[in-house]
Amino acid sequence: MGAHIFSAVVGATVVGGLISSAMALVAWRNRDRPAVAAFGWLMVVCAAWAFTSSARMLSQDPASAYLFDRFVRVASSSTTPLILVFVLSYTGRDALLTPRFVGLLWLVPTGYVLLSITAPFHALEPGPGSSGSVTNAGITAPVVPEGLPSDVDLVFTYVVLAVALLLLAQFLVRSRAIYRLQTTVVTTAILIPTIVNMATQFSDFSHPGIDLTPAALGVTALVLGWGLFQY
């Protein structure tokens, strides 16, 4: 049973990456529409997260798992800032997206990625020798431990997501009725991976080497794309 669940998670994650890739292509073809360019970049990063996460789960040795985990961290830490960029663009706050603001928004993710890449040279993040395989509930998968910078990035992620959701809630209240359904769809699309990520982080139902968030982002890609291009 565990092997079937693991295969299903990997398959769902790969499908999520394919869906995000397709949505990125659709966004490119419609890049002149409002907020679609930001949506396209978000989809590119979501696809990268899904594919690298799949590769990490399927890694046969700790060194490969650790390497793919570095790419996972680059993609995952960039997803939330891009969500906020998309929300600001969608709600008509493009004027806030100055180079200074965008640089500040990526300050924490950039620091996190640099500390992750340079982990062999300091003790803030576990190095390559820390990764290994763990068997839990019949599932055997690689596990790469995390350090304090990962916790800081996680807190930053939830703060940025909270800001994005508050901006959408404000826009929902103030917008005309014709846009309210679309805004509700956009908000739902962002809530889906947020809830899944929190469940993965704070509950014991999943294997420590499995993150369901990339698979959930495939659902986000479908819902968000439908919401943007349907209305």
Where are each of the predicted segments found?
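Hydrophobic transmembrane alpha-helical segments in integral membrane proteins
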Residues: 1-19, 149-157
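Helix-loop junctions on the outward
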Residues: 2, 48-75, 89-94, 118-139, ...
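Interfacial "cap-and-anchor" motif at the non-cytosolic start of specific transmembrane alpha-helices
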Residues: 6, 10, 36, 40-43, ...
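Membrane-embedded alpha-helical segments of multi-pass membrane proteins
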Residues: 15-19, 71-82, 156-159, 215-220
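Internal transmembrane alpha-helix with an interfacial aromatic "cap," most often the third helix
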Residues: 20-28, 77-106, 162-169
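Transmembrane alpha-helical segments that serve as helix-helix packing and pore/cofactor-lining elements
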Residues: 27-36, 62-66, 90-97, 165-184, ...
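The cytoplasmic-loop to transmembrane-helix boundary for the fourth helix
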Residues: 91-150, 182-188
